[in-house]
């Protein structure tokens, strides 16, 4: 399983420096929605990292898909956490609460 990161150039740069290979720069809402859809269809991606503010820019239909996604697990960074917490997402993906 791989980690994918989608966001503006500044957001993905840090992940590139950390060695994440699947990084996608999306500077406008249309490109963002297109790239998210592409990554959601990639069976090799286990975790998708997004900026919280980007979630507000995509269509509501895609937001619902992201909120209900088990694989890949969607992690949002920055601002208020959208939807479920990381703990809840991992619990849904793995089937076990790793914090207990």
Swiss-Prot record:
It comes from the Archaea. GO terms for cellular component: plasma membrane. It is found in: Cell membrane. The keyword Metal-binding does not apply. Coiled coil: none annotated. InterPro entries: ATPase_V1-cplx_f_g_su, ATPase_V1-cplx_fsu_bac/arc, ATPase_V1_fsu_sf. One of its GO terms (biological process) is proton motive force-driven plasma membrane ATP synthesis. The keyword Transport applies. GO terms for molecular function: ATP binding; proton-transporting ATP synthase activity, rotational mechanism; proton-transporting ATPase activity, rotational mechanism. Keywords: ATP synthesis, Cell membrane, Hydrogen ion transport, Ion transport, Membrane, Transport. SUPFAM superfamilies: AtpF-like. It is a peripheral membrane protein. Belongs to the V-ATPase F subunit family. Has multiple subunits with at least A(3), B(3), C, D, E, F, H, I and proteolipid K(x). Component of the A-type ATP synthase that produces ATP from ADP in the presence of a proton gradient across the membrane. This is A-type ATP synthase subunit F. It comes from Methanocorpusculum labreanum (strain ATCC 43576 / DSM 4855 / Z).
């Amino acid at each position: 399983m791989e980690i994918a990161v989608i966001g503006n150039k500044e957001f993905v740069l840090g992940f590139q420096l950390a060695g994440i290979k699947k990084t996608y720069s999306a500077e406008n809402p249309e490109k963002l929605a297109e790239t998210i859809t592409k990554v959601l269809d990639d069976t090799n991606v286990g975790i998708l990292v997004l900026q919280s503010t980007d979630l507000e820019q995509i269509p509501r239909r895609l937001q619902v898909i992201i909120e209900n996604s088990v694989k890949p697990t969607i992690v949002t960074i920055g601002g208020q956490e959208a939807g479920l917490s990381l703990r809840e997402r991992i619990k849904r993906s793995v089937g076990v609460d790793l914090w207990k």
